[in-house]
Every structure is written in structure tokens, then in C-alpha cells.
Curated annotation (Swiss-Prot):
Biased composition (Basic residues): 254-275
Regions of compositional bias (Basic and acidic residues) in chain numbering: 28-38
Gene: rplB
Summary of the function given for this chain in its UniProt record: One of the primary rRNA binding proteins. Required for association of the 30S and 50S subunits to form the 70S ribosome, for tRNA binding and peptide bond formation. It has been suggested to have peptidyltransferase activity; this is somewhat controversial. Makes several contacts with the 16S rRNA in the 70S ribosome.
Disulfide cross-links: none
GO terms under cellular component: large ribosomal subunit
Region (Disordered): 28-53, 222-275
Protein name as annotated: Large ribosomal subunit protein uL2
Alphabetized SMART domains for the sequence: Ribosomal_L2, Ribosomal_L2_C
Organism listed in the record: Marinobacter nauticus (strain ATCC 700491 / DSM 11845 / VT8) (Marinobacter aquaeolei)
UniProt-recorded Gene Ontology molecular function terms: rRNA binding; structural constituent of ribosome; transferase activity
GO biological process, one term: cytoplasmic translation
Length: 275
């Protein structure tokens, strides 16, 4: 996918780096699979901010993605690739032999006209979705389920993938990009290949306004606030905050572990931080 640098005709365009993909559909999305999406501004039902730095941005519509891929044994063909404002990966509109259309996460290297299948008898090729028990060990996969039938939860963003490294009994072992190795039930499904749009990390927005278009508001440093607003706030002149970095609520940050789900610790074979 070509990388486009804009001419510095203004300060806002000087640092912009865009990605150009001529294969993406230029029209409107497939309407039956589009739903309205309301803005929350980071507020809950009481009106209080529960997530900071959210607000504004261009109006978006949600594309309903098929993360379960349960239409087994029915041949399908990719009709077109599309941009999705709700995720970094591209999506593909798939048409099945029975006439139904669904959106899926577009695998890397696939284009309009390519066939895709799902089910235990699906061919071992990029875009096929199978249970982990039917995927060869060593394969690169994405859109991996954590619970059978729940739908894909792992490796869904642009360029993401995991590797199937072992299979023993009821569990398969996968290696995540972070280095973590974890066990997943062999009945969980995954799609062969990597996620599309792997060059997404090379994009540069170029100006603050481009973040605002995406609904992201500015992040103010704690040391620039008043004492009433942040534990690092206040002081005469510029200060370092006077303590180890904490969140606005006093919880240690920058390396502090926050994982609380001890129930699934037994599924993690090796931590991402293990040497």
C-alpha cells in the first residue's frame, strides 16, 4: 500500500503521512449491515465522565462485523474491501452462495473475488476460519476466540496476528505478538493469516485537529493542573510532581500492574514480561 506524504503547503500538512489503498470501495457501506452509533462524550447515564479525552469528532456509523464465522460449508466470495472508521483494520464484504452478505475483518493479501470458507472442512489457506483443532501447528492466525462460539476477541486490529505453537488434549497454545503464551480451547475458532492494513502504524495525523476529527480530546499533564485536580498539581513554578507517577485518583501508573482476573491466570503459560 503506497505511503503518501503531503506537500507542506501549510503547517498542518507538513507532517501528514497518509496511506493510499486503491482497492478500497469508494461508495457507501452495505446499508443492511450498518447501524447508528451515538456519541457519549465519555459520559455514563448519570452524565459523569467515566472515560477522559473523549468528545466531538465526525459522526460515524457502526458496521456489523461477523466475528463468529458460523456459516459452515457455504462457499463465499469477497465482493469488496472497505474502510471502517471504527477500527484500524479494513473490512471485507463477503457474499455467500445463498445470497447473504456479511462483513468480516479483511485478512492481509486478500482482494475482491477471492473465495473464503469456514468450518472444519475449510481449506487451509488465508481467510479460512476453522477450529484450532483443525489448524496446522505453526500457522499464523488472527481473530481468535477465547470461548467457543463467543466470537473473535484476540488479534483483530490492523496487522495483528498470533501463532499456533502447540496443541495437547483439549487446549492449544498460542503465542501473542507481546510475547505472552496462553492456552485456548481447541474448539475455539480462528482465521488463517494476518489482519490487513499492517502499515497503519506508519500513519501520521500531522496536526491536533486530526485527532479532534477522530473524537479524541487533549490530554493535560497532571503537573500542569491545580492540587484540587490531580495529585501532581500545584507548587510554585515548575515541579516534577514530587512523587512517583500516579493517576488522577492516586493509583500508581507507568508500569503498575492492573490485571485483576486471577481466574484465568492458569491459562497464561508465559507472561509477556518474562525474560
Amino acid at each position: 500500500m503506497p505511503i503518501v506524504k503531503t506537500k507542506p503547503t501549510s503547517a498542518g500538512r507538513r507532517h501528514v503521512v497518509k496511506l493510499y489503498n486503491p482497492d478500497l470501495h469508494k461508495g457507501r457501506p452495505y446499508e443492511p449491515l450498518v447501524e447508528t452509533k451515538s456519541k457519549s462524550g465519555g459520559r455514563n447515564n448519570v452524565g459523569r465522565i467515566t472515560t477522559r479525552h473523549i468528545g466531538g469528532g465526525h459522526k460515524q456509523h457502526y458496521r456489523v462485523i461477523d466475528f463468529k464465522r458460523t456459516k459452515d460449508g457455504i462457499p463465499a466470495v469477497i465482493e469488496r474491501l472497505e474502510y471502517d472508521p471504527n477500527r484500524s483494520a479494513h473490512i471485507a464484504l463477503v457474499k455467500y452462495a445463498d445470497g447473504e452478505r456479511r462483513y468480516i475483518i479483511a485478512p492481509k493479501g486478500m482482494k475482491a473475488g477471492d473465495p473464503v470458507r469456514s468450518g472444519v472442512d475449510a481449506p487451509i489457506k488465508v481467510g479460512s476460519t476453522l477450529p484450532l483443532r483443525n489448524i496446522p501447528v505453526g500457522s499464523v492466525i488472527h481473530c481468535v476466540e477465547l470461548k467457543p462460539g463467543k466470537g473473535a476477541q484476540l488479534a483483530r486490529s490492523a496487522g495483528a496476528s498470533v501463532q499456533l505453537v502447540a496443541r495437547e488434549g483439549a487446549y492449544a497454545t498460542i503465542r501473542l505478538r507481546s510475547g505472552e503464551m496462553r492456552k485456548v480451547l481447541v474448539d475455539c475458532r480462528a482465521t488463517l493469516g494476518e489482519v490487513s492494513n499492517s502499515e497503519h502504524s506508519l500513519k501520521q495525523l500531522g496536526k491536533a485537529g486530526a485527532s479532534r476529527w477522530r473524537g479524541k480530546r487533549p490530554t493535560v499533564r497532571g503537573v500542569a493542573m491545580n492540587p484540587v485536580d490531580h495529585p501532581h498539581g500545584g507548587g510554585e513554578g515548575r515541579t516534577s510532581g514530587g512523587r512517583h507517577p500516579v493517576t488522577p485518583w492516586g493509583v500508581p501508573t507507568k508500569g503498575h500492574k492492573t490485571r485483576k482476573n486471577k481466574r484465568t491466570d492458569k491459562m497464561i503459560v508465559r507472561r509477556r514480561s518474562a525474560k
